[in-house]
């Protein structure tokens, strides 16, 4: 979110729906299109980047997600998705084999869930260290 105020606004909306403090992974009973709608209502400059898109079960492209395409997940708001976070279940070369991902910026992160892979992937930005600077990079 572009500001602390808009982040608080979104946080309050999400807290009214479900548990956002459980263990770092909010438990919400809403679909992805509605979540993105809430992000954009909190601030029109807000961004949602689907994360861990290749996690095998319930990720965007997981076998249990029910989605065959990003558009199935985000519906009429799909055009607001410009980047995807690949997660540790893939690698950059694998991601570029699927041409449907060519129109998205791909970001990769490592996290404490997989200690042996910590730091395996990272994002490097050149430019001003600010919210807008990320998008200008």
Specify the residue positions occupied by each region the protein language model found.
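Active-site glycine- and acidic-residue-rich loops that bind
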Residues: 25-30
């Amino acid at each position: 979110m572009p500001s602390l105020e808009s982040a608080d606004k979104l946080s309050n909306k999400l807290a009214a729906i479900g548990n956002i403090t459980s263990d770092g992974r909010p438990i919400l009973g809403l679909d992805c299109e509605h979540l993105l709608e809430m992000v954009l209502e909190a601030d029109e400059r807000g961004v949602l980047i689907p994360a861990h898109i290749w996690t095998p079960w319930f990720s965007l492209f997981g076998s249990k997600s029910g989605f065959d395409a990003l558009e199935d997940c985000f519906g009429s708001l799909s055009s607001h998705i410009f980047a995807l976070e690949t997660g540790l279940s893939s690698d950059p070369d694998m991601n570029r084999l699927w041409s449907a991902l060519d129109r998205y910026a791909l970001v990769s992160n490592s996290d404490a869930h997989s200690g042996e892979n910590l730091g395996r992937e990272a994002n490097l930005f050149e430019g001003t260290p600010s919210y807008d600077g990320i998008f200008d990079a």
